[in-house]
Design a protein with these regions (language model features):
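Acidic, Gly/Ser/Thr-rich repeat motifs that build Ca2+-stabilized beta-propeller blades
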Residues: 1-111, 165-185, 198, 233-271, ...
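Acidic/polar, solvent-exposed loop segments in beta-strand-rich repeat domains
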Residues: 110-122, 138
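Conserved strand-loop elements at the edges of beta-sheets that form or border functional pockets
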Residues: 94, 158, 294
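Mobile, glycine-enriched helix-loop/loop "lid" segments at the mouths of ligand-binding/catalytic clefts
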Residues: 192-220
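Blade-edge beta-strand/turn elements of extracellular beta-propeller
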Residues: 2-22, 59-83, 122-162, 215-233, ...
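Extracytoplasmic, non-cytosolic globular domains
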Residues: 117-130, 154-187, 191-192
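Repeated scaffold domains used in trafficking and secretory/extracellular systems
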Residues: 287-291
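Acidic/polar loop patches that form or flank catalytic/metal-binding clefts of enzymes
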Residues: 136-141, 175-178, 197-204
């Protein structure tokens, strides 16, 4: 949908309801505007189809009406997701390098039963990095597993359960990844945007603890989170953005996040691999937070499962 000059337009820009599935955790998961959207009017859409597979397709605005997408989309990525209807991933977004990044869940089920997240031959439980200048996509030569037998060259990072949102912070040269835990810990990872081939640990670890918690584990080569919290505080992390707006300059550089069950709003700063200056904001009764948004001015928005959208402002 498009909100234009404060008014919600009657006709949706794009309707995928006939092709998509909302079973389990499926549905329309995220969208990303091409960096040259003002010129090419390309929108990349991340959703699950009726078979439960993870798709990314490119749509363009109609020549007749720029507020409505052309009917036919261009296929970009199709990832089979046949076993479970949860852990479909996360987000599609363009990085500062102009590449398209896609986070995928581990394929679902408790404890990653198919062992996808640590399998470099699978695209599940990963962050993928793609060059979409020519459809469907090309593999960037700088991806970490290019030309390595048995390893998918699309992979940028791995060892993720279901990263519910990731966000780039170009001024800080950082990538923030919020990964939903199994039954013990929720985690936030923050790494340099240039860091590739990182293993975030799942299902060897869940946050900062071994998985399962009763077992010993080898953490060699694993990238630890900058922050994790237990399920006394929530059950499913929702990652946001680093604030870079002008309305509240004192918040510049803070990463905002929430939790679907906790209902709170928190922020932190990232410094040398550590979460600092953590703040729990006084969020009015709002609903289960499912996502965040960021406008062209760097101001942030919070979205709830009850359909509410609110902008974060100074009280």
């Amino acid at each position: 949908r498009i909100v234009q000059n404060g008014i919600l337009l009657a006709a949706p820009f794009l309707d995928l309801s006939a092709r998509g599935s909302t079973a389990g955790e499926g549905g329309l998961l995220s969208v990303a505007l091409h960096p040259e959207f003002a010129v090419n009017r390309w929108l990349f859409v991340h959703f699950t189809n009726t078979a439960g597979d993870i798709l990314v397709e490119r749509y363009a605005a109609s020549i007749v009406d720029p507020n409505i997408a052309q009917t036919a989309g261009t296929p970009i990525v199709a990832i089979p997701h046949p076993t479970f209807n949860n852990h479909n991933g996360g987000r599609v977004a363009f990085g500062p390098d102009g590449m398209l990044y896609l986070s995928t869940g581990d394929g679902g089920g408790a404890g990653d039963p198919d062992r996808n997240a640590q399998n470099l031959g699978s695209l599940l439980g990963k962050i993928l990095r793609l060059d979409v200048a020519v459809p469907p996509y090309m593999i960037p030569a700088s991806n970490p597993f290019v030309s390595q037998a048995g390893r998918r060259a699309e992979i940028w990072a791995y060892g993720l359960r279901n990263s519910w949102r990731f966000a780039f912070d170009p001024p800080g040269a950082s990538l923030f990844i919020a990964d939903v835990g199994q039954g013990q810990r929720e985690e936030i990872n923050a790494v340099p945007t240039s860091a590739s081939g990182l293993n975030f640990g799942w299902p060897v670890t869940e946050g900062t603890i071994c998985f399962p918690a009763s077992a010993a584990c080898d953490r060699t080569g694993l990238q630890p989170p900058i922050l994790d919290y237990d399920h006394a505080q929530g059950c499913s992390i929702t990652g946001g953005y680093v604030y870079r707006g002008a309305a509240m300059p004192e918040l510049a550089g803070r990463f905002f996040y929430s939790d679907f069950c906790g209902g709170w709003l928190r922020s932190l700063r990232h410094m040398s691999g550590t979460a600092t200056e953590r703040v729990n904001w006084n969020l009015p009764t709002f609903g289960a937070v499912v996502s965040f948004g960021e406008d062209v001015f760097g101001e942030l928005y919070v979205l709830a499962s009850n359909g509410r959208v609110a902008r974060i402002v100074r009280n």
